[in-house]
Amino acid sequence: MASVALEDVAVNFTREEWALLGPCQKNLYKDVMQETIRNLDCVVMKWKDQNIEDQYRYPRKNLRCRMLERFVESKDGTQCGETSSQIQDSIVTKNTLPGVGPCESSMRGEKVMGHSSLNCYIRVGAGHKPHEYHECGEKPDTHKQRGKAFSYHNSFQTHERLHTGKKPYDCKECGKSFSSLGNLQRHMAVQRGDGPYKCKLCGKAFFWPSLLHMHERTHTGEKPYECKQCSKAFSFYSSYLRHERTHTGEKPYECKQCSKAFPFYSSYLRHERTHTGEKPYKCKQCSKAFPDSSSCLIHERTHTGEKPYTCKQCGKAFSVSGSLQRHETTHSAEKPYACQQCGKAFHHLGSFQRHMIRHTGNGPHKCKICGKGFDCPSSLQSHERTHTGEKPYECKQCGKALSHRSSFRSHMIMHTGDGPHKCKVCGKAFVYPSVFQRHERTHTAEKPYKCKQCGKAYRISSSLRRHETTHTGEKPYKCKLGKACIDFCSFQNHKTTHTGEKPYECKECGKAFSRFRYLSRHKRTHTGEKPYECKTCRKAFGHYDNLKVHERIHSGEKPYECKECGKAFSWLTCFLRHERIHMREKSYECPQCGKAFTHSRFLQGHEKTHTGENPYECKECGKAFASLSSLHRHKKTHWKKTHTGENPYECKECGKAFASLSSLHRHKKTH
């Protein structure tokens, strides 16, 4: 095996190069360095406490010199006195480099592989730094120093450029400038993506074999680092260290503006940009800016269509690793995090915490109009559209505009019929599992969201929130003409009553509608589609609302009660019609009993109860009735017996069943 010098193990990046690396490359580099140094027998370092990313905030110390500094002083404070031959064979062998003999330090007699490493080592050991810069002010390191010194003249020149801002080396591909030639060369290599060590499975190239070895674990699934507390295993040492903080709760990085603390420096930096608004990472295709490189990388995949993360169980691919992890939990039924307010359960703690913000409204990002808080800026931006009415996502097929991208994607499936989640009952497809689950409740009639005040249940959480405002009386959206609305959607719909605008037109008959759902409902009159079926009598309906109203025939529910006479009705239209009876003048009076009516036809029907006249006869059984409506009700009893053979209306007291609701009511009076 060929020998490798220590400087081949310790690789430098400048501040500019470090900024160019993506999050995956940074993490991989950290893992390699941590794992490599852990394998050095004589280099006993406190690497676990070392934040590699911090070194690239202030890249003023040569990393190789730092390593050799620690090489001189062992962990217990004694001199190392060990030779390179004692380093593990996997890192450095006993043989020297071709043509280069082992160089011995005159300071302590240690042997170090390679002349440049020796130079650095001797200078560190002797404290000899011939190039000193006297204008350098206080450093942001743990100790303050003036007049920073350097072991090499080129390092001294590069450092000077930090103060002058001079960057004489330009990249011809992207135009970015660098303070040193080495930085430019490394930057160009990163941009080209070339390297001598290539992955046999995916073809990705790397500059160092150790990076390739770490990358190969993404294919093999090898996880050598196991947490002692929860037995969770990790492919990379840095991931293991990050995970450890979930047990200890350590959050060493605190924001000076809002005092929020973070376990990782990268998370802290990302958070800081929410205050400053800085977005240094731009998409090369559409120039959209992002606060961190990972968000930019994820966004760029929307242009390329790349989805590198695949589920092993179902083969579904994702552009983000977090999306894959969330998806994998859908194969497991376990949801350990349950909301005590609404009963909704979650697979992940983060999802649960975000959900709780919906109840409390205490998120860090506040809406200036209504004061509601959100967990992230994107959620706040989406919410602000409910106030502004902005709808940036427009469907090219039907012209409908939507406020949110997720709503737009769901809407497009209505046209295409494509979607990963298909309903087994009606075949309708959906993009998101949450929307699919909500749709399934239209078939099962499940209502998991209950009002704490009145006990009324709803299929959708938004319907519950809308209902809760009927108790509080809150109506924040006011029309200029005086009417107030519960939510922004109702307010927008109300405005069309003044303008008369009807933007949604049926392509078949040309009829226009003010709301998209009215158009969708109307389309079923052309297609004849009736997806909602009554479980009792199997009658089908084109609209869910019609099914709900129909079900009252079987249940006997009469939610609309007249305050004047106490009469109850199953349907709102009948109730409103009845209310007018009390409001109108009753000028038609029965001469026999004195009862008054608003219309002459009502009086004529009533008079038949005195005369015993029954002009309306049933052709099937010969039974006669005083009114046509009574005959129609009677005919339904024949239809039900013929077609269903059942009596759906059962008396709860004696168990006797009846074909019609009116028969059940008459029977109840006998009890």
Curated annotation (Swiss-Prot):
It is found in: Nucleus. One of its GO terms (biological process) is regulation of transcription by RNA polymerase II. Residues 4-86 form the KRAB domain. A zinc finger (C2H2-type) spans 134-159, 169-191, 197-219, 225-247, 253-275, 281-303, 309-331, 337-359, 365-387, 393-415, 421-443, 449-471, 477-498, 504-526, 532-554, 560-582, 588-610, 616-638, 649-671. The keyword DNA damage does not apply. One of its GO terms (cellular component) is nucleus. It comes from the Eukaryota. GO terms for molecular function: DNA-binding transcription factor activity, RNA polymerase II-specific; RNA polymerase II transcription regulatory region sequence-specific DNA binding; zinc ion binding. Keywords: DNA-binding, Metal-binding, Nucleus, Repeat, Transcription, Transcription regulation, Zinc, Zinc-finger. Its main location: nucleus. Induction: Induced following exposure to ionizing radiation. Signal peptide: none annotated. Belongs to the krueppel C2H2-type zinc-finger protein family. May be involved in transcriptional regulation. This is Zinc finger protein 443. It comes from Homo sapiens. The lineage of its organism: Eukaryota, Metazoa, Chordata, Craniata, Vertebrata.
